[in-house]
Amino acid sequence: FDFDIADDLTKKLGLLLLQGWSSQSEERKINFNKWVSRHSWVEDYATFVVIREEFNMLPWWEWPQEFKIKNNKFLKSWIKKKSEEILIKKLIQWHLDEQWSVIKNFAKSRNIKLIGDLPFYVSRDSADVWSNKSLFSIFKNGDLIFQSGVPPDYFSSTGQLWGTPTYFWS
């Protein structure tokens, strides 16, 4: 997989979506705003990605202090300045969600079941962890308190450490 090509294509897609945004019908814009309201994660995700790009893809715990914590005055002001870039990220997610819905509906119409069967943990350097630190086993500086993995078994005599934070269950 060529990440550079994927990044370039994603940037081009984002610019095309933004260029077409002003000519969208009011109904389409309303649908987008409803989608954003129903998917509260997208605000944090889009903000996170734009900040990450601002700092050359550094992980969030290496960002300047004022960017590490969501919902501070500085960050709110910065978000307003970057509103167009953040909109692009949200438009891309909306576009992808629309495509995924088409795929799901096609599969369902053919009685094809889509399943996922992988252990799932969130990356430490993700919008989810950055914006919801209290839900994960991490220190304030981003270091892991506990990390996911599996003990030794048939597949690995030494076990595995995956380097992703575990969920912080109270």
Describe the predicted segments one by one.
Residues F1-W94, V122-S170:
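Alpha-amylase-like alpha-glycosidases and glucanotransferases acting on alpha-linked glucans and related
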Residues N111-I115:
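Structural preference for beta-strand elements that scaffold enzyme active sites
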Residues F48, A107, D117:
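Conserved, mostly hydrophobic/aromatic
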Residues I92, L96-S109:
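Active-site neighborhood of glycoside hydrolase catalytic domains
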